[in-house]
């Protein structure tokens, strides 16, 4: 199982579990149920008083908050995202004496700066929200504020003749910025609608924290919704102030857009010489040259239009030196598409320029077009190979170049878009482009890069609910073609519930142990004349017959069918172990039987190393 290896020694998983419990593996108990045998630890933990627990709990919670930048205030040494002026810690009606961030706990809170009482005494912990709302004009509950904002902005969108687009991240941000939300509808100059929609939305959403509104066709309307922290007595002035700020920002966006349109993307390629990709790997212009070569190579393998892919690769980074992307970095690729369309580039080229950044994160959409997929693969493989060459592989939780995300993107594209390419070949092709530029990639760097990409399978498929032993079993059989890996893994996950799967897994585990412990090497070919026992003759014949039977299924990647055929070997395998002694004194006979077992193991390894499947069952025999 996962807790002990074949020699009965505890695995790192078992020792780690014991260490986390503060005991040794020997002190753990064994629990057996219908799902197998488990290691467990039981301990009696005495209760503790709330007042002794609350302060360390508060400190722990504060430390775990994802705050990238902390600040200090006053003369104290406490650090937090913003200055902290009071702390309320109550258990029922009683103040729990403790301290956090240099502040002693009490029962005095504060209301809304403009709409509530300056000092509010909280009599009872259960009255906290009600008291703050009544006396302080503060809606303390985050979810309540969020729902209120959503209702308000939705109503205003309808009032404007459209529908408010509620971005969840923006909703969370605005909810955290206000205590008493009050939404206001504003307008901007319709002339700005000539600027790319994404830039207008970015100005509203990312820069101003405004919600935008679309019509029934999904077109942007020249209105916005801001959420104020007060109900102003002069809402017109508040609205006018927000309109003035937004119109100024949109005017900047229009200026950059009109300026960028004066130069075609093709004229910007040389500017990439001035943009560093990596100190050891050259500029973005150098990367562009490599992408052109690699994209063509991938296009040839997939038998798709090389010219379109090469053109998209030539232009794909040029929008990075435009004013629009300088102002809106999050729109890289999108601005490239707009500018390519303006330059009358082929539609497929414009689309690929935008799509080659997909997926941007784990759950993002994938490139929909073939040139987009080709370029997305080339871009990520080039970065992976180059940065491993430069010694920038991720360590621990540090991944400054996003290589885990890049590797996962490669795997997702190949699997979900059913692109049957080999990772090893992609890495080798990319390494060739570096070598052609005078920067050869060593064998070790390539090996590390390939292993790194394949290791992404674990996180991806574990998140999809596949067991680690299933993933390990397929990885052991080879996983350089992600689409093929996906098909084999799904077939194996179903096969493990087959009535003969457990017995075959146990038999394969025994075969693996025998082969590993054997001191002599296995012969390249089986010698039929040395097959003397009827059980080993039957096994040899069954292996030959099964190999021929599964070959067509494997050729068409029908792994469920191949595994069903392999399952038919169980009776002859069980008989072999019941009737045949492998490790006999006769060396030629022993070598021949080891060779026979090697052939059997290799037959299963065309799909997976099923000996790695965890099962309590063991084969009988000698």
Regions inferred by a protein language model and the residue ranges of each:
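Amphipathic alpha-helical "coupling" segments that flank catalytic cores
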Residues: 1-622
């Amino acid at each position: 199982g996962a807790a002990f290896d074949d020699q009965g020694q505890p695995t790192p998983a078992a020792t780690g579990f014991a260490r986390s419990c503060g005991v040794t593996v020997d002190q753990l108990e064994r629990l057996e149920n219908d799902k197998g045998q488990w290691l467990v630890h039981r301990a009696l933990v005495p209760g503790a008083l709330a007042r002794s627990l609350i302060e360390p709990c508060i400190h722990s919670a504060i430390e775990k908050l994802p705050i990238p930048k902390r600040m200090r205030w006053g003369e104290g040494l406490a650090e937090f995202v913003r200055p902290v002026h009071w702390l309320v810690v109550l258990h029922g009606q009683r103040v729990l004496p403790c301290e956090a961030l240099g502040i002693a706990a009490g029962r005095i809170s504060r209301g809304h700066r403009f709409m509530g009482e300056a000092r509010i005494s909280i009599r009872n912990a259960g009255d906290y929200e009600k008291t703050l709302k009544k006396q302080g004009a503060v809606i303390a509950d985050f979810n309540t504020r969020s729902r209120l904002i959503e209702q308000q902005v939705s109503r205003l969108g309808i009032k404007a003749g459209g529908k408010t687009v509620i971005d969840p991240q923006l909703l969370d941000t605005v909810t955290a910025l206000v205590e008493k939300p009050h939404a206001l509808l504003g307008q901007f100059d319709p002339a700005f609608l000539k600027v790319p929609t994404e830039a207008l939305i970015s100005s509203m959403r990312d820069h101003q924290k405004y919600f935008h509104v679309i019509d029934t066709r999904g077109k942007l309307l020249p209105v916005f919704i801001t959420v104020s922290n007060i109900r102003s007595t002069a809402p017109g002035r508040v609205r006018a102030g927000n309109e003035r700020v937004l119109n100024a920002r949109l005017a900047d966006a229009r200026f950059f857009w009109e300026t960028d349109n004066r130069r075609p993307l093709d004229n910007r390629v040389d500017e990439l010489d001035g943009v560093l990709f990596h100190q050891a790997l050259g500029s973005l212009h150098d990367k562009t040259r490599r992408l052109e070569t690699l994209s063509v190579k991938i296009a040839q393998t997939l038998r798709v239009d090389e010219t379109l892919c090469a053109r998209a690769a030539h232009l794909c980074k040029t929008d990075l030196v435009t004013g629009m992307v300088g102002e809106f970095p999050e729109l890289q690729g999108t601005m490239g598409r707009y500018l390519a369309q303006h330059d009358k580039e082929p539609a497929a080229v414009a689309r690929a320029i935008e799509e080659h950044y997909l997926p941007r994160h784990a759950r993002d959409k994938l490139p929909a077009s073939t040139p987009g997929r080709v370029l997305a693969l080339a871009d990520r493989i080039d970065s992976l190979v180059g940065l491993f060459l430069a010694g920038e592989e991720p360590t621990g939780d540090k991944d400054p170049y996003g290589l885990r995300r890049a590797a996962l993107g490669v795997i997702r594209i190949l699997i979900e878009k059913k692109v049957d390419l080999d990772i090893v070949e992609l890495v080798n092709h990319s390494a060739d482009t570096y070598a052609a530029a005078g920067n050869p990639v060593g064998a070790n760097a390539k090996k590390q890069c390939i292993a790194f990409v394949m290791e992404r399978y674990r996180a991806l498929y574990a998140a999809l609910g596949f067991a680690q032993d299933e993933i390990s079993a397929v990885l052991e059989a080879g996983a350089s073609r992600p689409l093929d890996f996906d098909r084999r893994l799904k077939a194996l996950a179903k096969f493990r519930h087959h009535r003969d799967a457990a017995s075959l897994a146990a038999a394969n585990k025994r075969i693996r142990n025998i082969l590993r412990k054997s001191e002599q090497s296995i012969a390249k070919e089986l010698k039929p004349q040395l097959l003397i026992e009827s059980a080993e003759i039957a096994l040899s014949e069954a292996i030959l017959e099964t190999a021929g039977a599964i070959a067509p299924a494997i050729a068409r990647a029908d792994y469920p069918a191949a595994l069903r055929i392999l399952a038919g070997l169980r009776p002859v395998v069980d008989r072999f172990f019941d009737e045949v002694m492998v490790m006999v004194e006769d060396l030629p006979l022993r070598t021949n039987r080891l060779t026979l077992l090697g052939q059997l193991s290799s037959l299963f390894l065309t799909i997976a190393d099923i000996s790695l499947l965890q099962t309590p069952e063991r084969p009988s025999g000698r």
